[in-house]
């Protein structure tokens, strides 16, 4: 039986985190939630998830910095980072990609689109 894919949800809004957890677990993913940037970074280094869903406006450490640090480390640089945020400006999107994000989606979002993007990012061809 194949190993369940693990997704780290870095989201400080509990309702959004719970919604993501619910839908991802229904799709067969194992999930962990981090409510601030420092916790997200630590959990990423400790658990090495298969994907990180990353909000930008996180307490303690901004999502751009979390992404930059994950992509700079040899132990986590292969992990796809999917930014999911209300920051919808072109400047924020460009900065997210510059920091190493593999995808960027704005809130509010459509769950079917989010799940399709996650499935694409988790395909072997999108790995390291």
Region annotations inferred by a language model:
Residues 55, 85:
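Active-site residues of response regulator receiver
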Residues 33-51:
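Acidic, metal-coordinating helix/loop segments flanking the phosphotransfer/catalytic sites
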Residues 109-119:
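C-terminal output helix
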Residues 11:
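Conserved acidic carboxylate
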